[in-house]
């Protein structure tokens, strides 16, 4: 792989605090987002991703304030998702200091919004966040066996996850953030089959997310086709040198890291 693999801590932000659960349930407080962002920047993170998991839209302004304060503190790229519905939200995030915006539910509901945002700001600004899971027994099967979910992984759509990733790439998204709902927070490793299938379908950069529990879990995700790897719990509650451990594991497997 010619381009260095990026290692990206993810901060799930709820009402101005970082939280983390298992399969998007049982959220527990992990700290102040600005402090954590500063810590990860100093530790050598290549980027940061903020995902606003706030249930109430009334707390969105809190998130914009967090983005502004974080952007003043850290100097690595910052991607922000959650509640992004169109050009207006992306514009506001960029003005508050974000470098990229991630879109999920709104794009599933109205795919044309991808075209509108990329036409306005360029592909490099837009990340499609795909929360995918294996189809459930009794639910409508999909060709790949994976379906797209919305609303933080709570709502199945019946849309094939691989086909959706391909459509979004064709529409011009700059990157795809592929999160396994089944693996999320379990610390059992990434869903390598899903990564391989999406990699075979798209040429845009692919960020793998969901399931990292130890440094050894990261190299297989890169080998499966991920250009970047994203994790939360392992960084929030792991030792202070976890970023170095993860990068060493990837480097020792023969991949370039920054």
Curated annotation (Swiss-Prot):
EC number in record: 4.3.2.10
Pathway as given in its UniProt record: Amino-acid biosynthesis; L-histidine biosynthesis; L-histidine from 5-phospho-alpha-D-ribose 1-diphosphate: step 5/9
UniProt keyword Translocase present: no
UniProt-listed InterPro entries: Aldolase_TIM (IPR013785), His_biosynth (IPR006062), HisF (IPR004651), IGPS_HisA/HisF (IPR050064), RibuloseP-bd_barrel (IPR011060)
CDD domains: HisF
GO molecular function, one term: lyase activity
Highest taxon of the lineage: Bacteria
Catalytic activity: 5-[(5-phospho-1-deoxy-D-ribulos-1-ylimino)methylamino]-1-(5-phospho-beta-D-ribosyl)imidazole-4-carboxamide + L-glutamine = D-erythro-1-(imidazol-4-yl)glycerol 3-phosphate + 5-amino-1-(5-phospho-beta-D-ribosyl)imidazole-4-carboxamide + L-glutamate + H(+)
Location of this chain's protein in the cell: Cytoplasm
Record bears the keyword Lyase: yes
Residues the record marks as active site: 12, 131
One Gene Ontology cellular component: cytoplasm
Subunit structure: Heterodimer of HisH and HisF.
Name the UniProt record assigns to this protein: Imidazole glycerol phosphate synthase subunit HisF
Provenance organism: Pseudarthrobacter chlorophenolicus (strain ATCC 700700 / DSM 12829 / CIP 107037 / JCM 12360 / KCTC 9906 / NCIMB 13794 / A6)
Taxon lineage: Bacteria, Bacillati, Actinomycetota, Actinomycetes, Micrococcales
Name of the gene encoding the protein in the UniProt record: hisF
């Amino acid at each position: 792989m010619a381009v260095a693999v990026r290692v990206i801590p993810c901060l799930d932000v709820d009402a101005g605090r970082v939280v983390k659960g298992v399969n998007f349930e049982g959220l527990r407080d992990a700290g102040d987002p600005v402090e954590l962002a500063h810590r990860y920047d100093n530790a050598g993170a290549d980027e940061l991703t903020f995902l606003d998991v706030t249930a109430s839209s009334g707390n969105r302004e809190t998130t914009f304030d967090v983005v502004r304060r974080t952007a003043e503190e850290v100097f690595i790229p910052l991607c922000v998702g959650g509640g992004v519905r169109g050009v207006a939200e992306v514009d506001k995030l960029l003005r508050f200091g974000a470098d990229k915006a991630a879109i999920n539910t709104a794009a599933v509901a109205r795919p044309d919004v991808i075209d509108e945002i990329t036409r306005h700001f360029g592909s490099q600004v837009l990340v499609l966040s795909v929360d995918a899971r294996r189809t459930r027994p009794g639910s409508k099967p999909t060709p790949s066996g994976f379906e797209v979910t919305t609303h933080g992984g709570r709502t199945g759509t019946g849309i094939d996850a691989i086909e959706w990733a391909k459509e979004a790439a064709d529409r011009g998204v700059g990157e795809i953030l592929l999160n396994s709902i089944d693996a999320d927070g379990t610390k059992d490793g990434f869903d390598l089959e899903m990564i391989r299938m999406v990699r075979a379908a798209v040429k845009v950069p692919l960020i793998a997310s969901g399931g990292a529990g130890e440094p050894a879990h990261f190299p297989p995700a890169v080998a499966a086709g991920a250009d970047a790897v994203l994790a939360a719990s392992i960084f929030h509650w792991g030792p202070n040198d976890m970023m170095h451990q993860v990068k060493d594991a990837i480097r020792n497997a023969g991949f370039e890291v920054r």
